[in-house]
């Protein structure tokens, strides 16, 4: 079956689909659909999607980015929490036989098992236009649960992308910066203005690619302890480090110095 070129990226086509189904945006899901083909092409290119790739897309919406991914990849699994979008996805993706849609909360999906089943356990690529309110739990969940991921290429709030990529000495440097950079190398691909979305978000956005480290930059015996110390340290910036560590999660053993080695 010859793949059909993506067509949903054009604003008029998005509007037509929304009107056809009388779709009402759900604020609780943070829905902002991309309507710029150039940005969509840039996301797929940044993710390095090729004909051998199995891709997991989080939050496909009406299937706009999904079409672009399906056109480039071997297969796509799209996880959508909003049941009202499922009939729309069945329509907009009907020309693509390499897409599977799962109606579920991605935080409840065993992506490691999915990778094992669909990709023979090989690292997968994750691509998403993420709801901004749940960006950090999703990204850190992928890393902390040790899902076999090659890279994560996502649209996020620009402020969050800056925090992920920034280095020591910046006012934006914090626990999120350290956590993301422990697992991956972040690279901001592009800044995306509000007019590239429907409806327009109130904040600027950015596409960021997180490439998983082949070798971890730090060896640790206890990731949970290490990140507890990191969070406590940054939460107590105006207090002494000793007081910050004292307020860390109630670990009595081992000693904090045993939690990480360089």
Language-model region placement:
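Short, cationic motifs built from Arg/Lys/His that form the positively charged side of catalytic pockets
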Residues: 163, 237-238, 257
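Single conserved hydrophobic/aromatic residue that forms the stacking wall/gate
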Residues: 251-262
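Catalytic cores of RNA-modifying enzymes
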Residues: 1-232, 248
């Amino acid at each position: 079956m010859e793949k059909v070129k993506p067509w949903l990226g054009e604003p008029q086509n998005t509007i037509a689909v929304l009107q056809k189904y009388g779709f009402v945006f759900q604020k609780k899901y943070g829905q902002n659909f991309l309507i710029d083909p150039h940005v969509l092409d840039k996301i797929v290119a940044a993710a390095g999607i090729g004909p051998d790739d199995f891709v997991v897309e989080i939050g496909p919406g009406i299937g706009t980015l999904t079409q672009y991914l399906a056109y480039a990849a071997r297969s796509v699994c799209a996880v959508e929490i909003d049941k009202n979008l499922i009939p729309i996805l069945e329509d907009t993706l009907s020309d693509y036989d390499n897409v599977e849609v799962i109606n579920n909360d991605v935080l409840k999906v065993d992506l490691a098992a999915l990778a094992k089943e669909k990709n023979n356990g090989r690292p997968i690529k994750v691509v998403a236009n993420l709801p901004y309110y749940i960006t950090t739990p999703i990204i850190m969940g992928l890393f902390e649960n040790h899902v076999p991921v090659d890279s994560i290429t996502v649209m996020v709030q620009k402020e969050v992308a800056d925090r992920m990529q920034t280095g020591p000495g910046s006012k934006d440097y914090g626990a999120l910066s350290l956590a993301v950079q422990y697992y991956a190398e972040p690279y901001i691909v592009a800044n995306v203005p509000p007019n590239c979305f429907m409806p327009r978000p109130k904040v600027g956005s950015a596409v960021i690619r997180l490439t998983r480290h082949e070798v971890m930059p730090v060896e640790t015996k206890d990731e949970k302890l290490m990140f507890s110390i990191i969070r406590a340290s940054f939460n107590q910036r105006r207090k002494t480090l000793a007081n910050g560590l004292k307020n860390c999660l109630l670990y009595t053993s081992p000693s904090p110095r045993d939690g990480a080695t360089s």
